[in-house]
């Protein structure tokens, strides 16, 4: 959960305010760590909760309810003195599951292609592409303003698998 502190430190040093952090939620480990880091910054280091960016997980495998249960269990096991299962500090969207882990649709593939060709950002359809597409849609749907940070948590092997399976 030290990564959250690193993000906040980088933001301070570079005079950037992140209003939202988005990432894929699969096993729940990364979002659990970020949320634990946020709670630690608030309770131990005295950060105001209003200074902390909202953490948004885009589920790639589970329903939002099940993903949230897993994450809350993780949070409580990190440090029960700092965490409480009744408070979370994050939200989960399962609106982009496309039927579950490993499933995707043409919209996700179009997003992946656009990001690759316009920004040289490789995304895979199973994990990071689904999450990035979900982030774009959540920003549109909820009219989120400010700066959004997308945490690319991997998926490179899946990206290369996908690239090899595409027609030349």
Could you describe each region identified by the protein language model?
Residues 1-94, 98, 152-168:
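Glycine-rich phosphate/pyrophosphate-binding loop at beta-loop-alpha junctions
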Residues 88-145:
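Active-site-adjacent helical/loop segments in soluble small-molecule enzymes
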Residues 20, 146-147:
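Residues that mark the start of a beta-strand
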Residues 126-128, 151-154:
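Short, loop-centered acidic/histidine patches that primarily coordinate divalent metals
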């Amino acid at each position: 959960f030290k990564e959250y502190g690193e993000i906040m430190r980088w933001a301070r040093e570079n005079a950037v305010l992140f209003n939202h952090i988005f990432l894929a939620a699969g096993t729940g480990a990364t979002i659990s760590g970020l949320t634990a880091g946020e709670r630690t910054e608030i309770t131990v280091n005295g950060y105001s909760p209003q200074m902390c960016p909202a953490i948004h997980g885009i589920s790639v495998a589970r329903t939002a309810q099940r993903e949230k249960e897993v994450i809350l269990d993780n949070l409580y096991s990190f440090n029960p003195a700092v965490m409480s299962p009744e408070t979370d500090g994050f939200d989960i969207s399962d609106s982009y599951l496309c039927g579950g882990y490993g499933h995707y649709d043409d919209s996700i593939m179009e997003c992946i292609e656009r990001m690759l060709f316009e920004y040289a950002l490789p995304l895979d359809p199973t994990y990071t592409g689904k999450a990035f597409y979900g982030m774009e849609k959540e920003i549109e749907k909820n009219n989120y303003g400010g700066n959004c940070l997308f945490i690319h948590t991997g998926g490179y092997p899946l990206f290369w698998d996908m690239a090899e399976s595409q027609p030349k």
